A protein has these predicted regions:
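Flexible glycine/acidic-rich beta-alpha junction loops that bind and position SAM and/or redox cofactors
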Residues: 47-52, 198, 254-259, 288-296, ...
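Canonical Radical SAM [4Fe-4S] cluster-binding loop centered on the CxxxCxxC motif
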Residues: 133-170
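Glycine-rich beta-alpha loop elements in corrinoid/cobalamin-binding modules
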Residues: 1-108, 326
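Catalytic cores of alpha/beta
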Residues: 54, 231-232, 292-307
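Active-site beta-loop-alpha junctions enriched in small/polar residues
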Residues: 16, 45-47, 193-195, 219-225, ...
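Conserved SAM/AdoMet-binding glycine-rich loop
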Residues: 10, 37, 41, 173-282
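N-terminal [4Fe-4S]-dependent radical SAM core
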Residues: 99-139
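Radical SAM enzyme core and accessory elements
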Residues: 352-421
Length: 421
């Protein structure tokens, strides 16, 4: 249905990935040109991370949008709506960046709302029936920020101002139950940066206690065996978590140490076994080319993955590999010398870049990193037969497959049938 834009006074556009910048700003410009009465406000992590660059970007405020909200936006957006309705000056809207008389103004930031003041998400105005899914898979967050928050490459907590807080686990179970009944689905994606073991333990027990029928996936950080025990994963699986995503990054202890992952290879191996034995599908994220990483250290990661693959112990079921990317506002970006980064290359034609090329003093050159990456890609083609299935599905679609067929049946499918991409 076509919207009557005359009924609206404000449009908010979230841009959370660099690939959304062009379509997001194109939409903003078209709306602004066609409906000049609208106030266009931008949110999301991309412009949050570029807030310091907006002082000399008056053209963006003139041609594309009127304001930007940084950090968490619930309270600032409410304040912005109220100010626009009453015609008040925007100077007291927290977290707002806007232009006044050719000058870009950064308003004072407000403290984020406590979790008990955040409302349950609603999806009422989304055409869920038009998604190419037999059932909707709804996103849900039981926490904001990262409880660890130390990984030297990571910027995921930046939009939360490195402030971690979580929902009461009883309320999590109640809200999942409510959303499941309201939208007639049992499928969810927990979008937390990482669910802590203690929170996972209490959450699973509350979901089981309340009898909520749920199927979901979640993100975890590797922790010691007493924190991520067999008993924890048994409860997690019984509560409905069929798939867990772990940030392995590396299986070399030196690299893990300078990344500040807070774990070692032995911990990674133990946790993956505990999770797999409970019936959970384990997916790993890893990368090659962290500054100072030598080829022998990258081979540790390859060897670990192969030894625990489908053709090995069977504790790793899928994997997503990449080449290390140096991101703006990471610990490495702010202290490159500590990580033997000789130079971060700032291209003047890419003044809103988030990822930067760099030169190193130690470690594999970029060409060798690419060679390792391509070698790993060929290795996992042989050691993960089920890659023919999961490599071509989004994680939400794959969650439905896991619930429909089960982990073992999917693995058997790949072994017993010829599945062409």
């Amino acid at each position: 249905e076509k919207a009557d834009w005359n009924d609206y006074g404000l449009v908010g556009i979230s841009i959370i990935h660099s690939g959304q910048v062009i379509p997001g700003l194109t939409l903003a410009r078209l709306l602004r040109k066609r409906f000049p009465h609208l106030h266009i406000v931008i949110g999301g992590s991309v412009f949050n991370r570029h807030a310091d660059l907006l002082d000399n970007k008056q053209a963006l405020f003139k041609d594309f949008f009127h304001s930007v909200i940084v950090s968490e936006g619930e309270k600032p957006l409410e304040e912005l709506v109220n100010h626009l309705k009453t015609g008040q000056a925007l100077a007291t809207v927290p977290n707002l960046i806007y232009m006044d008389d050719e000058k870009v103004i950064h308003n004072t930031k407000a403290e984020a709302l406590p979790y008990d003041q955040l409302v349950c998400p609603t999806f009422d105005q989304l055409p869920l029936e038009k998604y190419l899914m037999p059932y909707p898979v709804l996103p849900y967050m039981s926490s904001r920020g990262c409880y660890w928050g130390k990984c030297t490459f990571c910027t995921h907590s930046f939009i939360y101002d490195s402030y971690y807080r979580k929902e009461n686990e009883t309320r999590v179970a109640e809200e999942i139950d409510y959303l499941s009944k309201k939208y007639k689905t049992k499928y969810f994606t927990f979008s937390d940066e990482a669910i802590s073991p203690n929170a996972f333990n209490r959450m699973s027990k509350e979901i089981l206690k309340k009898g909520v029928e749920m199927r979901s996936l979640g993100m975890l950080k590797f922790e010691s065996g007493d924190k991520e025990s067999p008993e924890l994963f048994e409860d997690v699986h019984r509560a409905g978590f069929l798939m867990l995503f772990f940030g392995l990054e590396s299986a070399n202890d030196r690299i893990l140490s300078i990344i500040d992952k807070g774990c070692d290879q032995a911990t990674e191996k133990s946790v993956l076994k505990n999770s797999s034995d409970a019936g959970i599908w384990n997916h790993l994220y890893l990368f090659f080319g962290f500054p100072t990483e030598e080829r022998e250290e990258a081979e540790d990661t390859i060897r670990f993955t192969v030894e625990n693959s489908e053709t090995g112990t069977g504790h790793i079921h899928s994997v997503g590999q990449s080449i290390f990317a140096l991101e703006k506002d990471s610990a490495i970006y702010h202290n490159p010398g500590k990580f033997k980064v000789d130079r971060i290359i700032h291209d003047p034609d890419r003044d809103m870049a988030i990822v930067f090329d760099f030169d190193i003093k130690a470690g594999m050159p970029r060409e060798e990193v690419m060679d390792v990456y391509e070698h790993f890609d060929s290795v996992i083609e042989e050691t993960f037969p089920s890659r023919k299935i999961w490599n071509y599905l989004s994680r939400e679609h794959f969650l439905l497959y896991l619930d429909r067929f089960g982990k073992e049946e999917i693995l058997n499918m790949a072994h017993s049938a010829s599945v062409e991409p």
